[in-house]
């Protein structure tokens, strides 16, 4: 029998506070069969965050130990804090044929896309810079200087979105979630349609002949 096909690796990124995490969580809540890779970080928890749900919150020393041990699929330092994607979980789940979503920053997304060219890349953008400013300010965790810095960097982020497979404008959560779901369904259908290699393998093994 042919090997079980690997699951999709879906990379979702976008400017800070664009709402990519909210989109991913909403999709996971109503779409069975998709797994979420929880990243590790050294940044402090924000109000309402739970260890192991939004992130695994670990010390800088522990993070650096895991870097040295090669335990991260990708990692980056962003605004003075480390962020990284555990390698073992992603490789294990996709090998089992399950789809995995990564909600990561653009530096990490770039690293994953280089390692996994077949990954499905999705870039989330705000409907306007004013909407992004309001979302950053609404967090209540950023200083005015930090808000200004993130807004100044946003155009560069958005230009990078030109290299992604798909772009979602997050002006309505339900619509954004529906678009992400449609992207995943289309990609899964595409992998099924591109089944020539499987047929060739079965023919070579004689599974589709009368011999």
UniProtKB/Swiss-Prot annotation:
GO terms for molecular function: ATP binding; guanylate kinase activity. It is found in: Cytoplasm. Its EC number is 2.7.4.8. ATP binds at residues 14-21. It catalyses: GMP + ATP = GDP + ADP. Its main location: cytoplasm. Pfam families: Guanylate_kin (PF00625). Keywords: ATP-binding, Cytoplasm, Kinase, Nucleotide-binding, Transferase. The keyword ATP-binding applies. InterPro entries: GK/Ca_channel_bsu, Guanylate_kin-like_dom, Guanylate_kinase, Guanylate_kinase_CS, P-loop_NTPase. Transmembrane segments: none annotated. It comes from the Bacteria. One of its GO terms (cellular component) is cytosol. Residues 7-185 form the Guanylate kinase-like domain. Essential for recycling GMP and indirectly, cGMP. Belongs to the guanylate kinase family. This is Guanylate kinase.
